[in-house]
């Protein structure tokens, strides 16, 4: 736990100079990214908290850090005495917006960098601040955390960009742009502005490496009825990228030109409206509801801009047949790597009695993955956790200080990889000794929830919000639960966390029905602080299913799991399973064995482990 006093003192000095009483520091970058480059880790620099979600609020006298249930334990360990932890979602705990507003009473000024907060979020915060008696929310264009950070702030990455060929992307750029223009035409819209990095990468069939674990690059895009413009540092583009963009009629402009161009376009459209006459564009500019307040302001704000769920994000979430085949294929290869890893780890710990720590295990898994076709890198830092560490939902082991894996305690491994044909995310919880009855019961309740969701059949139009209880039902019957969502969308060689779909209790999961081609995780869990944690995660694709009847002339949907890794036989309490659940497990084990055994010719150790862990459950 580092002392945050020096950076807080610098920030407060800068706040006083600007007559700011409350300063909001979001986690995200100017593209609303969940995972960010080191240069954008402002909240981490100021607070010491390294989780991927949260918001810091600093006043002249106090400081608070708000985060969700995935990070309660981690934040409690990382924050020093300067900070109050706001555990979001718990009863009687204010939201970060409420806490910030409460500090503004008496006409005090609340400020934020407008490039780091969505326009809709800024409006909500402003309303709450005004209601609490504060002054209007101030958009402070200079980021004063960056000033406090000074020369020690890392440089912005400038990694090369590569083309994702159509045989892997499944849909050409021209088709994607034309489909987007059709959406714009419905609203007589003069332009859509793309700010999310994964949306830009998907739209132009390009991939980058500016943000760790996410194959994206710093960029914006503007799509009008006549033009398509990519704003990017041109030094990132080699001749193959330039040729690819020329062939698809995409202009390239410098990254820093985006906001000046947006302001100029607003001026031009405003002039056309005022001039009147035939051909006048009457629609508003469209931006994502995740786009920054700064973008909305550049385009004229209210009256000129309409915020909506991004049509690019919606299209990206529905995988085409090529992408779905890629997801199937990469999960088989990824499953083979995990199977080889678990067999190796058990041999090291239980048979050879060799001490392996959490980071050494994670490094070995990455080494095994790297041997497989199309491997690019990890899709997030591996959560390799033993014993009580497994109860920390997003635990991050650190070299030199992490725990040695105890074969007599639960081991939880949540990991994933980026392959050029897809993105993986798999969690398995194992025990290399004799698990307790409590551990077996918890594991089996979680497994029953995973099966319940995997086997769900539901009418078209159903949201992930409606399905969440299927994964929790068996835990609920025992008075248990978990403080995270059940499922998130997954990109295709893109971000491992992808909207707009998901399975959980978040409001946004009520907005978009699941559709064939969606790819989601299925990851129920249970965590006993200070003791152990259980999580099991598969990746599933939504598909149409045939039913005996067709009530209301609706089509019905279900899931196809693509993860190919056995469950831990020693943690399964067989008497808790129904006959149908046992049949599902046996069919799954047969599927895993059939799809992965070909990778282990001549590898007796791994083949023996795979055979044992896929044996029939009686």
Curated annotation (Swiss-Prot):
What are the alphabetically sorted keywords of the record?
A: Aminopeptidase, Hydrolase, Manganese, Metal-binding, Metalloprotease, Protease
Its UniProt entry gives the catalysed reaction(s) as: Release of any N-terminal amino acid, including proline, that is linked to proline, even from a dipeptide or tripeptide
- Binding-site residues, Mn(2+) 1: 425, 523, 537
Species lineage: Eukaryota, Fungi, Dikarya, Ascomycota, Pezizomycotina
Query: Do you know which PROSITE patterns this protein is assigned to?
Result: PROLINE_PEPTIDASE (PS00491)
Q: What does this protein do?
A: Catalyzes the removal of a penultimate prolyl residue from the N-termini of peptides.
In the Enzyme Commission scheme, what number(s) does this protein have?
3.4.11.9
Q: What is this protein called?
A: Probable Xaa-Pro aminopeptidase P
Binding-site residues for Mn(2+) 2, renumbered to this chain: 414, 425, 537
- Keyword Protease attributed: yes
Entry's Gene Ontology BP terms? proteolysis
Q: Which family does it belong to?
A: Belongs to the peptidase M24B family.
Q: Does the keyword Magnesium apply?
A: no
Gene Ontology terms for molecular function? metal ion binding; metalloaminopeptidase activity
Q: Which GO terms describe its cellular component?
A: cytoplasm
Cofactor stoichiometry and binding? Binds 2 manganese ions per subunit.
**What cofactor does this chain's UniProt record say it requires?**
Mn(2+)
Which gene name belongs to this protein? AMPP
Q: What class of enzyme is it?
A: hydrolase
Q: At the top level of its lineage, which domain of life is listed?
A: Eukaryota
């Amino acid at each position: 736990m580092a002392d945050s006093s020096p950076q807080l003192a610098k920030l407060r000095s800068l706040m006083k100079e600007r007559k700011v009483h409350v300063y909001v520091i979001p986690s995200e970058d100017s593209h609303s990214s969940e995972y960010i480059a080191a240069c954008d880790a402002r909240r981490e620099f100021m607070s010491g908290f390294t989780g991927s979600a949260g918001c810091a609020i600093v006043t002249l006298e106090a400081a608070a850090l708000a985060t969700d249930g995935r990070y309660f334990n981690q934040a409690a360990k990382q924050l020093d005495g300067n900070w109050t932890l706001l555990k979001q979602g718990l009863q009687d705990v204010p939201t970060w917006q409420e806490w910030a507003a409460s500090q503004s009473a008496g006409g005090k000024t609340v400020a934020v960098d407008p490039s780091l907060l969505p326009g809709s979020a800024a409006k909500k915060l402003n309303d709450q601040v005004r209601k609490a008696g504060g002054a209007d929310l101030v958009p402070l264009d200079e980021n004063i955390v960056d000033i406090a950070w000074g020369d020690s702030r890392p440089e912005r990455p400038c990694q090369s960009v590569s083309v994702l060929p159509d045989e892997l992307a499944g849909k050409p750029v021209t088709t994607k742009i034309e489909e987007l223009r059709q959406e714009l035409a419905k609203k007589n819209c003069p332009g859509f502005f793309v700010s999310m990095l994964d949306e830009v990468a998907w739209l132009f069939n390009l991939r980058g490496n500016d943000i760790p674990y996410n194959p994206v690059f710093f960029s914006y895009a503007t799509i009008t009825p006549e033009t398509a413009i990519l704003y990017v540092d041109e030094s990132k583009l080699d001749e193959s990228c330039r040729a690819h963009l020329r062939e698809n009629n995409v202009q390239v402009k410098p990254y820093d030109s985006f906001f000046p161009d947006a302001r100029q376009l607003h001026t031009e459209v405003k002039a056309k409206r005022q001039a009147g006459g035939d051909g006048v564009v009457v629609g508003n500019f469209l931006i994502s509801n995740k786009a920054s307040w700064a973008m909305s302001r550049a385009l004229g704000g209210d009256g000129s801009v309409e915020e909506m769920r991004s049509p690019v994000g919606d299209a990206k979430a529905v995988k085409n047949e090529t992408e779905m085949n890629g997801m199937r294929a990469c999960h088989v290869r990824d499953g083979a790597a995990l199977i080889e890893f678990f067999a190796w780890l058990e041999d090291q710990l239980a048979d050879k009695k060799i001490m392996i720590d959490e980071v050494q295990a994670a490094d070995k898994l990455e080494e095994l993955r790297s041997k497989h076709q199309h491997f690019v890198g990890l899709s997030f830092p591996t959560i390799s956790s033993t014993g009580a560490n497994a109860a920390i939902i997003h635990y991050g082991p650190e070299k030199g200080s992490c725990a040695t894996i105890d074969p007599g305690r639960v081991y939880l491994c949540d990991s994933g990889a980026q392959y050029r044909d897809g993105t993986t995310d798999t969690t398995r919880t194992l025990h290399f000794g004799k698990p307790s009855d409590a551990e077996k019961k918890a594991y089996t309740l979680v497994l029953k929830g995973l099966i319940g969701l995997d086997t769900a059949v539901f009418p078209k139009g159903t949201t992930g919000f409606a399905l969440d209880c299927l994964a929790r039902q068996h835990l609920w019957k025992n008075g248990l639960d978990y403080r995270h969502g059940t499922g998130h969308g997954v990109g295709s060689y893109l971000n491992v966390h992808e909207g707009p779909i998901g399975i959980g209790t978040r409001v946004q999961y009520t907005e978009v029905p699941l559709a064939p081609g969606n790819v989601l995780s299925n990851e129920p869990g249970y965590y006993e602080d200070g003791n152990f944690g259980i999580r099991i995660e598969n990746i599933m694709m939504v598909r149409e299913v045939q039913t005996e009847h067709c009530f209301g002339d609706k089509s019905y949907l279900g899931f196809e799991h693509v993860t190919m890794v056995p469950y831990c036989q020693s943690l399964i309490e067989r008497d808790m399973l129904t006959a149908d659940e046992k049949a599902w497990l046996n069919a799954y084990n047969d599927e895993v064995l059939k799809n992965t055994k070909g990778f282990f010719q001549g590898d007796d150790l791994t083949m023996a482990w795979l055979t044992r862990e896929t044996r029939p459950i009686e």
